[in-house]
Amino acid sequence: MTDLTLALDVMGGDYGPRVTVPATLQALHLYPSLHVVLVGNQPEIEHFLPKAESSIRQRIEILHTTEVVSMSDRPVHALRNRKQSSMRLAIELVRDGKAQACLSAGNTGALMAIAKVLLKTLPGIDRPALVSCLPAVNQKPVYLLDLGANVSCCSETLFQFAVMGSVLSEAVDKNEQPKVALLNVGIEEIKGNDQVQQAGQLLQQSPQINYVGFIEGNDLYSGNVDVIVCDGFVGNITLKTSEGIAKLLVNQLEKGLTKGFFVRLMAKLIAPRINSVLKQMNPDHYNGASLIGLRGIVVKSHGSADESAYLQAITLAVTEAQRRLPKMIEERLESILLDINN
């Protein structure tokens, strides 16, 4: 891995430096060529660094600021009035070429607003989209977008999301010709609102996208497709519902395995397999949503993420930076739009 720098808004999220700094130290151990800029309150950050090895400490820079975007800040307010916030300064490092990607667990709306203004969207992209992974029965990643950055979308925007999702699957998972579907209330061509139907027609006209049609909610986790596209209203509800069901299943499984002597004995015997299943079902295993469609890389972590989950988000940011995802999306989109116009 060539040297790369991540800018981390370590003050964002429910736990701030208590989680973000220890997780970053783990990432620095995993990636010897990784450098980080920790943006936030320096005394609070330093509190979690005394035990860091000198070789690790040399790859850490601290950019001090005491201003933070709160979870209650409206996006416009954060954009206009939080110009020295840890979130904004982290994004500015990407804009200025001092970091290849940034990560924040802070206010999603503010992150989108600030990132869009500072980094700008790629040519041919009207709006950035939030995208993340869903688990599937075949254990391969399935990308779902948009997850809430755009509550309502026209057909052209959905088409752009499909292109970006396809390129993401290719870049991150080395997936040739990823299968792309539109989330709908039925698989028949007559089903769905005008926006979804028109987006389907646009995708059918694009031979470079492996569009397979509509997909219903009960097929989300089948692994039959690689990219699922919808507007942010539907996507956010889908994601939160999925996370809620996963937590319920994990909780019920853990409770069931502690009832009775023989059940506990069997649970111990098959513990490795059970732990593997629980890990696959745990939403933390899929932490990290990418704000794609921008000229720079921005990754959003869950605000409630623990160290393990935050480390997953760092890993995602590193992967996208290594693959130069924005450049890949830009080149592919240009080729696809040229195909359609011809």
UniProtKB/Swiss-Prot annotation:
Enzyme class: transferase
Pfam families given in the database record: FA_synthesis
Substrates-to-products reaction catalysed: a fatty acyl-[ACP] + phosphate = an acyl phosphate + holo-[ACP]
Example GO BP: phospholipid biosynthetic process
Domain of life: Bacteria
GO cellular component, one term: cytoplasm
Compartments where found: Cytoplasm
Pathway: Lipid metabolism; phospholipid metabolism
This protein's UniProt keywords: Cytoplasm, Lipid biosynthesis, Lipid metabolism, Phospholipid biosynthesis, Phospholipid metabolism, Transferase
Described function: Catalyzes the reversible formation of acyl-phosphate (acyl-PO(4)) from acyl-[acyl-carrier-protein] (acyl-ACP). This enzyme utilizes acyl-ACP as fatty acyl donor, but not acyl-CoA.
Subunit structure comment from the entry: Homodimer. Probably interacts with PlsY.
Name of protein: Phosphate acyltransferase
Organism: Shewanella woodyi (strain ATCC 51908 / MS32)
Gene: plsX
